[in-house]
Amino acid sequence: MTAGAVLVMGAGSVGCYVGGCLAAAGVPVTLVGRPRVLDAIAQQGLTLSAIDAAAHSVPASALRLAGAVPVDAAPALVLLCVKSSATAEAAAELAAALPPGTLVLSLQNGISNAAAASAAAPSLKVLPAMVPYNIAELAPGAFHRGTVGRLAAQDDALLLPWLPVFERAGVPLDLRAGLVAIQWGKLLLNLNNPVNALSGLPLRDELLQRGYRRCLAALIDEAMAALDAAGIAPAQLAAVPARRLPTVLRLPTWLFRMVAARMLRIDAKARSSMADDLALGRRTEIDAFCGEVVRLAQANGLTAPRNAKMVALLDVWPAQPQRLGADQLCRLLAL
């Protein structure tokens, strides 16, 4: 038995992967997204693959595709998967089309999206969640999960009927009493997104270059200082505790390979979503990553100049399409 129909608001990499897995498990799924993505799915369906699972296909006939929230939509659950900059607009569209009290799960990057969605759509029940894994669009209609992990969401009784559904679909969901620490733990790891995007390399190749790791370590150092000042203890989501991450990242590569073997359980296809954004000339979510660190630092009387520099670099990227080598990026961050 399914808990009901699902509407994915924002059919990008996360939305298509999670929504596609649910559809493959028999859940009625509507994907709301842009023509670039939906046209490819309409023509050839979805192809879903993962580092730890065989690839499988979801025919277009198993999905409902829409450019906007259908007027007759009445989902039991909405997965909000739009980019951070589109959160308020998407939430308002949902509120205008869906019954009051509709359950919305924010599967978005950053810290503040669920609050922003709630403010824009107070009639809806919005809960924050965290996506631990990397999903890349390998080709039109083809989405690949390149790392492992389990979804986490704010604990709420309304989500209990969905736990077996997500488990059966191969995208297991855990409920957590306090999600802020988990969200910050994920954001620390996501600080690698801009480094990876500017490198132009697959994730694993980038992490095996010490210069890029030094850049990431410097960004995490600033974030940890801000978190300490704010009294926030980030959850450990990697094999290494958050506070030790910068030290491990700065190790020589031969030693890093040994110490961080679990961290390197990334297949050759994996890359950051921000790299996909740059490749398509789209505005990135840098404000939800490094921008969040800058704001937390400022709110606690600190500065985060290297995170601010990353925001500046990514904000002008369409005008500067060159990739940055590790030494170049280190110089730009004054390392």
Feature roles, as predicted:
Residues 109, 113-201:
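Rossmann-fold dinucleotide-binding core
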Residues 5-6, 78, 104, 151:
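Conserved hydrophobic helix-helix packing surfaces used for dimerization/oligomerization
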Residues 4, 27, 102, 124-125, ...:
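A structural micro-motif
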Residues 221-335:
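NAD(P)-dependent Rossmann-like dehydrogenase/reductase catalytic/cofactor-binding core
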Residues 10, 33, 82, 108, ...:
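Short beta-strand/turn micro-motifs composed of small residues
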Residues 200-215:
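Active-site lid/adjacent beta-loop-alpha segment flanking the redox-cofactor pocket in flavoenzymes
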Residues 1-54:
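NAD(P)+-binding Rossmann beta1-loop-alpha1 motif at the extreme N-terminus of oxidoreductases
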